[in-house]
């Protein structure tokens, strides 16, 4: 697993051993960031939240492409260790915040985010629950983009969001949402 583009292009990312963490595949990340680039134009200055962060690959990719700051939300100890190691290895500590809390009950945001990534474990209903909790906690800024990765057999119809596009990549389904 590696950073795809930007200042840290080609830099490897550490991942915890075992099956507890399922990092977004490089191909799916490439597709996702292509979709986002066509809509956003640039990542410069954006504030990003990476929920169910795991290794932090999505938030770190956004930072590599110019995002101003990323907040990572994760509870798994092994994933947190890999995430913190990746942030340190890339020299991103000043542009990153790590919150060891549940992404499906994250509480109130200190500030709203322009771009949010959700990559919950497949098949547990966490995407819909997390989207509702994020909305309630004022995590998305007005007009924010939200990326949600699910398995191909999952669909989303979250209240308070509009689905911009859905794309299947391998075993993953990528949903791009906007705040209504």
For each predicted feature, which ranges?
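Class I S-adenosyl-L-methionine-dependent methyltransferase catalytic core
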Residues: 1-180
